[in-house]
C-alpha cells in the first residue's frame, strides 16, 4: 500500500535539482524506491535495514544509521523528509538540517494533520526564522518548504543521541534511546514471556544458544542472559534498536552478537 505523503514529497523532490537527500523510514516501500532510480544526484538516509538493502539492490546511494545526516558528508540543495511517527525523530532530523544544507538549500517536510504536520511547520518556521511555502494535498496532507534565514532554538529531541537507563530488572540495568517503538518502556507482553522462560529454565535448564528476532533495545536478550542463556544472537531492522541492544550487551558482558537484519 503506497503512502500518499511519501508520494507527494517524492514528486516535489523530482521537480527539484542539485544534490538531493531523502530521509526515509518505514514509510518507504519497494515500488516507490524503484521510481527514485531515475533521479540524478539523489541520496538516501535511512534507519531501516530493509530500506538500505533495497536501495543497494537498486544502485541508489544510501546510508544506514541512526538518522545521522552528517554521515552523508555532503551539503545538499534539498533535504526531503516525510515525518516519522515518533516526535523525537522528527525533531532530531529538523535540528540537523541547517548544518547539511547549502546556503540556498531547502528543507521539505510532509505529513498529515493527524500526524502533527501543522505544529511541525510552525516549529520549523520559528527554528529556521522563515515562513514556510505550503502546498496542500488530499485528506489534510501538507507539504512545506523552508529556507534557513536565522536559526533559533533547536527543537526538543529528547536527547536523541543519548542512551538512557530506563529501568532495572533481575538486578540488570536496561538502556535505551529514542528512535525505536516503545523505547522508554518495558513491554508487558515481553515481561510475561520472560516469566514463562524462567519457568522453562527451572524445569529444563537454560539453553546454550538463543535467537532474539526484532530485539528492540534488548530486553529479552538481557533477561535471558540473567536466567543463564549462553550465546545470544539478537537482530533488528532499526538502527536505534541495534545501537541500544549492543550497548546492553557490552555493559553486561553478554556473549553473542547484535546485527542488522
Question: Over which residues does each language-model region extend?
Answer:
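Conserved SAM/SAH cofactor-binding pocket of Class I
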Residues: 3-59, 188-261
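Structural alpha-beta junctions
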Residues: 35-43, 59-62, 100-103, 126-131
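Conserved SAM/SAH-binding loop
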Residues: 65-70, 261
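A short acidic, Gly/Pro-enriched loop at the edge of an enzyme's catalytic core
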Residues: 68-78
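A short SAM/SAH-binding and catalytic strip from SAM-dependent methyltransferases
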Residues: 78-89
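N-terminal auxiliary segments of SAM/dcSAM-dependent transferases
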Residues: 89-167
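SAM-dependent Rossmann-like transferase core, predominantly class I methyltransferases
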Residues: 139-205
